[in-house]
Amino acid sequence: MTIIFQFALISLVLVSFVLVVGVPVAYATPQSWVESKKLLWLGSGVWIALVLLVGLLNFFVV
């Protein structure tokens, strides 16, 4: 269970880093807003799912 928790936590950190860099870039380029909007929604959904997963796994690991 600890390995799954660590993998989820590392995934959350990596997705957070990608979103911190990617969101301003997506907003700064108006040409590809339609494509970027889909990726932003997908990234946000993955981030929320990972936050909930890490919270749930933290309950079982600790």
Curated annotation (Swiss-Prot):
PANTHER family: PHOTOSYSTEM II REACTION CENTER PROTEIN Z. The chain crosses the membrane at residues 8-28, 41-61. Belongs to the PsbZ family. It is found in: Cellular thylakoid membrane. This is Photosystem II reaction center protein Z. GO terms for biological process: photosynthesis; photosystem II stabilization. PSII is composed of 1 copy each of membrane proteins PsbA, PsbB, PsbC, PsbD, PsbE, PsbF, PsbH, PsbI, PsbJ, PsbK, PsbL, PsbM, PsbT, PsbX, PsbY, PsbZ, Psb30/Ycf12, peripheral proteins PsbO, CyanoQ (PsbQ), PsbU, PsbV and a large number of cofactors. It forms dimeric complexes. It comes from the Bacteria.
